[in-house]
Amino acid sequence: MGRSAKLLAVVLRSVDYGERDRVVTLFSRERGKLSAFARGARSSRRRFGGVLEPFTLLSAELTERGGDLWGLEDAAVERGFGNLRGDLARIACASYAVELTRELVRDAEPHEDLFDGLVAYLALLDEGPARPWDLRRFELDALRAAGLQPSLTGCARCGLPPGDGPARFDPLQGGVLCTACGSTGGVGARPISAAVLQALRSLQRGDGVEAGAGEGAEARAILGACIEIHLGKRLQSRRFLDEVGPMLS
């Protein structure tokens, strides 16, 4: 038998395997992302019950099986975030957050800040309504934890301050472009308003944001493009998130 481990982890994904079992993707503070085989999870609710649902925080007992797959021997809910599960907007945000986490990090790479940030964001959703700027903050925190933080205070190309003139955001370059560099920016570069740039900088500093719906939509598009460039695809949960967008407070 391989090594064993007891971890605090968030369920990122749970996939049925055959008629009896499940394979779950977990994200732990100590070991990062890992996959675990839950034998009998479908056929016996006594063993795992509703423990393996996505965005559940659980205590997991695992055993190495060889390769990249662990065996899930036992699991207990630490926090089920039950309040958020009755609201479509909060479900959409939580689903997006766990999928973004799953896609941004590699297996077996600890990201303590991202784990703490994900748990904090799920707790925020559990305790109150889904708010667009809270999700923008999580996106920025997730990008930073993965080493992909966009440059917002200096030009991503030349490094100089963007200045007071019109600025553009180029997701391929990895951030904001000053007026001079923006005039020759790539095809993916888009204008970024001073209000949105200031709001995103405030979020990066951990400060609060007061902005209107127009700025919120612009920030969502900018960070969404940045994430898609880094991942090379559009997240499946993004469509659901866009559909419930008008429901967000």
Q: How does the language model describe each region?
A:
Residues 1-249:
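Non-catalytic alpha-helical scaffolds and adjoining flexible linkers that form interface surfaces
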